[in-house]
Amino acid sequence: MNLTKMAVFAASLFCLACKNDIDTELEKKSIPESEIQKSEEKLPNEEELTPTDPDEETNKEETVTANATYDFTGNTPPPAPQGMKWVKISQLSDEFNNGFNTDKWTKSLWNYGVPVQMKAENSGVSDGKLWIKATLGNDPERWFETSRVMSKAQVNYPMYTVSRIKGAHISAYNTFWLNNGNISNRNEIDVIENNSNPSCNCQPDFPWQMNSQYFHVVNDDTKRNKGNFDNRELSDANPLKGVAWNEEYHTFGVWWKDATHIQFYLDGEPAGSVVSARDFTRELNIIWDLWTVDADWLGGLAKKEHLSNNNINTMKIDWIHTYQLVEE
């Protein structure tokens, strides 16, 4: 074995050891089943209760530029800072080609407000896709049957996660978010809360608007700001520019850079950002869910007749890739 091959072999062993160390630490941090439901709760009407603070800083350090090169598939993480590299976290990455991996994911079924009813059977994996389906139930109050999938492992900054998602075409939030805590004390990053088919006739931009934000709550004192981005503002070369959330799969990502800086991504491009008014202090779980409420800020209540249409009532997740930023 010559010196070059020996160097490459040694580097490979180092990378493998680094990856294994990250996954081992995540396994240690995975929360037990008994604590999952207690770890996250939020009101369904928080948008009304916690308006954006106009005084909070917005991070403008990353914007789409005409001469930049982007991977529109979303498969490539953002360029790592000098002296750093991205290492994939297997516990928080999945192609969903081998069924529902119960070592990585759990169905966390606490309810939002009416009409939502979380049910285990309304989510699963088939044909290489994780899916969450909204169906019509018989309960007169909780008739919107749906589900939620959450990671067992937790993660902290600096990290990047990206998921390829096609939204259900009903008036509901198709979500991809990170959270840890309860209504009174929590850290939360909402990568998307997307609704391609608002029923209220009051959210004309929603089919293309990426609703992204953070919540930082301490003893019921809420700090919040949004970094919403419209996919019609993607670069002209991006084939997904102006394509509604239900029409094609899009990739949605977030680079959680440090205790305050959060950069969102859409189809490989920077897509809005926020700077938290308080330091994030918690390790977060990754979550997908699908839910509705009778409120204009969500886009209006889902129509019952849409829940019986299997062509539009299902959110589909093709894959998720999550990375930790480490020193080279």
From Swiss-Prot:
It is found in: Secreted. Residues 18-67 form a propeptide. The active site is at E188, E193. Gene3D superfamilies: 2.60.120.200. GO terms for cellular component: extracellular region. It catalyses: Hydrolysis of (1->4)-beta-D-galactosidic linkages in agarose, giving the tetramer as the predominant product. Belongs to the glycosyl hydrolase 16 family. Cleaves the beta-1,4-linkages between beta-D-galactose and alpha-L-3,6-anhydro-galactose residues in agarose. Cleaves agarose in a random manner with retention of the anomeric-bond configuration, producing beta-anomers that give rise progressively to alpha-anomers when mutarotation takes place. This is Beta-agarase C.
